[in-house]
């Protein structure tokens, strides 16, 4: 269950921006980012939009941290959670671009502009890697770009190129560190809660998956997390529909009921962003096409923390 707490203004780290409602970083095309004009971090003020130097070639499916040292901003591949007094923020370099309409994305690697975060504007969970900001008007939340992986206890819940957690490849129970016997609703809730995340609600899933090619599915068991361009959403959520049925809930704030969203490869022309089993009657079921995807509240220091009905 995602925690719903308020962060005091006095907890703000040493970052100020011209506008608190957007990250300090901005994507420039597919392969470059910059620090926004008017940003002050670690005692340095960026008066103009300033390019970030990227160490080495960008790797598709990798997460990057951005540090500021001596007034110079640099991006580096983040093997772990980007942390430290000099870390300004980070981003994800996706294996394909976001949807621009309602026919999915493309297969050209790109920085996902929705994945940009900074220390004042980020997911509320501890690990911001592999997440994208989903927003509809004033409502904002962060969604895992990738389906939950079997080895999420080690790799985090959103990682490119890993075995998908499902009824045939169960993740470890956080309480015992032994694999679950079933990947049912309770197991999915527990798996994500251990990372400070929750499952998508009935109102959140169609927002996160909007932009996929509707009424379509991939041709077989995807097995690993990755790119399925026709079913990438406008926010860069990969394999967003028509790959795995994902566990979610109906949105009840007190007693949320298990639900399933998106459709799997078995659902063909029925799959899509509006595909849902609401208040699913068999939450103890576990199958090879039942997966999960994490979500987190939006944390905005100096502003607000957005939360919905995520459980």
Question: What are the language-model segments listed below?
Answer:
Residues 179-183, 190, 256-311:
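Disulfide-stabilized, aromatic/cysteine-rich ligand-recognition loop
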Residues 231, 246-253:
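Short beta->alpha transition motifs characteristic of CBS
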Residues 1-60:
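Glycine-rich, flexible loop motifs
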Residues 55-61, 231, 285-288:
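Extracellular/lumenal carbohydrate-interaction signature centered on repeated Trp-anchored short motifs
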Residues 1-27, 82-125:
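Glycine-rich, low-complexity segments
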Residues 70-73, 147-150, 212, 250-253, ...:
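Acidic glycine-/aspartate-rich tracts in secreted/extracellular proteins
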Residues 58-74:
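Elongated alpha-helical scaffolds
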